[in-house]
């Protein structure tokens, strides 16, 4: 399952991140979005997804949300 299809308000564990872009993978890693870390989907908005990672909230677009596998 990816972040795009994840249920709002539920905490998941990041299983993998594969954007196909090393720079974007590094950016997500710097936010704390990497395998084994908890992530919560706060809400799904039109064209984007709001997530909580560690102590921050971030809005990511649908394409990026599709690259983050959670379980």
Task: Give the location of each predicted region.
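A residue-level detector for short acidic-glycine micro-motifs
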Residues: 5, 16, 41-43
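Contiguous, function-dense segments enriched for cysteine-driven chemistry
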Residues: 10-16
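Absolute protein N-terminus
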Residues: 1-2, 71
């Amino acid at each position: 399952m990816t972040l795009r299809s994840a249920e709002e308000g539920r905490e998941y564990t990041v299983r993998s991140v594969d954007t196909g872009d090393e720079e974007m993978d590094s950016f997500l890693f710097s936010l704390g979005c990497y395998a084994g870390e908890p992530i919560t989907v706060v809400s799904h908005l039109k064209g984007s997804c709001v997530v909580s990672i560690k102590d921050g909230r971030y809005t990511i677009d649908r394409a990026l949300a599709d690259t983050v596998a959670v379980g």
